[in-house]
Swiss-Prot record:
Pfam families according to UniProt: Fungal_trans, Zn_clus
Assigned keywords, A-Z: Activator, DNA-binding, Metal-binding, Nucleus, Transcription, Transcription regulation, Zinc
GO molecular function: DNA binding; DNA-binding transcription factor activity, RNA polymerase II-specific; zinc ion binding
Source superkingdom: Eukaryota
Gene designation: amdR
The protein's name: Acetamidase regulatory protein
Composition bias, Pro residues: 678-687
Source organism (scientific name): Emericella nidulans (strain FGSC A4 / ATCC 38163 / CBS 112.46 / NRRL 194 / M139) (Aspergillus nidulans)
UniProt KW Transcription regulation keyword: yes
CDD domains: fungal_TF_MHR (cd12148), GAL4 (cd00067)
Matching InterPro entries: Amide_Lactam_Regulators, Transcription_factor_dom_fun, Zn2-C6_fun-type_DNA-bd_sf, Zn2Cys6_DnaBD
Signal peptide: none
Bias kind Polar residues: ranges: 644-663
Functional description taken from the UniProt entry: Positively regulates the expression of 5 genes involved in the catabolism of certain amides (amdS), omega amino acids (gatA and gabA), and lactams (lamA and lamB) in the presence of omega amino acid inducers.
Amino acid sequence: MSSTAHPTNLAPSGNGSAACVHCHRRKVRCDARLVGLPCSNCRSAGKTDCQIHEKKKKLAVRSILDPVPIRCRPPNPEEAPKPISSLSPSSEPPNAFTTALRAVQSDITAPSGVANRVAHIRSRSSQYDTKGTRSNNNSGNNTQYQNVLPEPDSPPYSRPAASDPSEGESRADIEKRLVNLIDGEASDSRAIQRGVRAIYVGHELSNMSFLIRQQRDTGDDVYHFAGNEIPRRQLRTGHDQLLMDALTLPEPALADELVHAYFAQVNPGYPIVEEELFMSQYRNRDPADAPPILLLQTILLVGAHVTRPKSERDTLKDIFFRRAKWLFDNRIERNRDILVQAALLLTWHSDLADDDVSANAHYWIGIAARIATGLGMHRNPVCSRFVPRDRRMWRRLWYILVQFDVMVSLSYGRPQALNLEDSDVSPLTFSDFEGCGARVQADFVIHFSELCTMISYIVRERFGLRISAERRKAALLEADEALANWSLRLPDRLRLRASDMDPWSAMLHLTYNNFLILLHRPHPRASAYSDDYGPHDAEICSAAAGVIASIFEELRIHDRLKQVWYSGVHTLFTAMIQVRVELRFSNPVLAINALRRFDSASYSLRELAQYWSHASTILRLFEESRRLQEDLRTTTSDRPRRFSNLSNNSTNSPASQQKNTSGIPHLANINSSDATPPSAPSIPPLQPSSQLSYEVPTTESAHHNPRSQPTLSAHTHTYTTQPFDTWIPSNNLTPMDTVDNSREMLDWRQLFSFTDLEGPVLPSTMEGITELEDEWRQIYWQETPMSDLLQDGGWMHG
């Protein structure tokens, strides 16, 4: 029996439509609201279980462009933690970041809610279009950066507890991996089995590759060694908590401090972010025009690197990195320009030293390079219909990416991610820095871009795998002359100075002198390229190492090591290898002077280890290797010396010299104690015909600049397609049979330009230069100061 009475529990629908479960399933029109239950269709079908279909309740979702306001966790009366601020620094780990998002706590235990929110976030278009310009449909962006009072009944989100003590032991083992590799007796015979991490020591320019290849003069090209076991990590943060954690911001006072620190200490030299645009968005607190959350999290990370003490720095950087990486990996930000900016800023995060391939700066530069070339940043945007602001930003980002790519390539001896032969981006000009703030270092960025571009071409011509021996030898001559011309043309504010060196000119000369050592130090195998060197390699490497050690000492004294980027650690590593060779000189004066440099460099490396985790592994290498310590003791002992007349005058001074914590002499006294210095010869002025045109080879410059197309002789016509030649004047492309004579004409002191040329700041000529040069090479080739610690592996190709 069926009832035709209208049910009393059927409320009229807002749109006048409702369906029973059967009609909803069949997707047919239902008249249950009009005739009651059962509906006409169910009565005709004889179904008695006719019921109104109830729609499932939709979870409240919010876009990343329309988040809820951020609030603080209610204070715990038992713990009463102190907030982190610039006014009240705390040595305890920061806990001001345990904030939560209001109105989403009900979804914490429901992973599907998070999935729905993420799907909705991805479906929403970004507030920026693909060119970085503002779109018009962003009125719903209600992002706020002030904290609001929490609801009393809402459960807060708290970070996981601190890690277990075993992680500290694992970190110590990771930092000692280089020591274990060095002191191990059979590191080259260990099989790379499953579960064991392979170590690629790099190629040619890598310091670890250079050290490992010294011991035996064999032909086996081994580049991979067995490392430690692959560590196992557990995810301490649940997947359902990652989204709300990534959208969390710190207290306004701390956020303001970190943002200001970034734009005051980092962005002037690496203008990745347009300061005026970002700060206007950040200060206005306009919900319709808020700064991108991904970019803000990465800026907070870099700001924490340069401001907070170590007790807070590591924790803060881990928090900001976790949030930024989640936002990056889940493609929350749809503007690809911001992805390039974020990837470059994430290079300031120092992950654990157990992985320098899929983490740290090398990894993020590779990602930034892929995105940038995918966007077409490597092509000249002049003729494109770009907004001028975006055109300037693209050029800046491209050349900063070139800088980072070259520096990381020199650090690890790995191929560069960018090939400048495929780029025709016009050189930077001062107009490209409009909107970057009054503190921007335009001179530094322009000249540093020139240096890194030149290094990129030199590395390919000097160290390329398929470069002929003749071309390789000629490239050394051309590189020296190009570098000397570039150095002599630096403006006075960027030249080397004896004291008070700003961090930007310091970074410029650290990279420059690091490359001089890599370019001129001998090959670790005596039989390979034994004639491929110049007559002044020892002086150049020694002077460059002294400059590097002095710059780091100057930065350490003025508390500016925090502004040194990732590659600075490897630059100091290069200098310490050279200084360690000098520790074995038979001349005691030179050995003691090298000991001063080594002590100063060790102090700087210890300070850098406070900021960069990979510096700790190098520090352990020099501090805990038993064989390295034995060589250091030998330097201060009364061992037989070749120069007996100098030995008697200096054997009673090493102990007192070693206690001197002032480190090495300043730049004004480089090598002044090596021997009786004659008057430094004056630098001959460059002739107008030999001036370099430091213009990046582009399609425009090839047609409009006749000097960029050198006239080659018959002996060098096969190299006309090499892009490096466009950086070298035509008279530098000397025929192969006159390379040695031409090299003698270049004064090696031209490679070192100082501000005050009237003082004794240039490296002076050392006594017995011929004997010193021979001894220097013999130490590299025969005594091998570090090869007795390391196993062989094939440092270079065949």
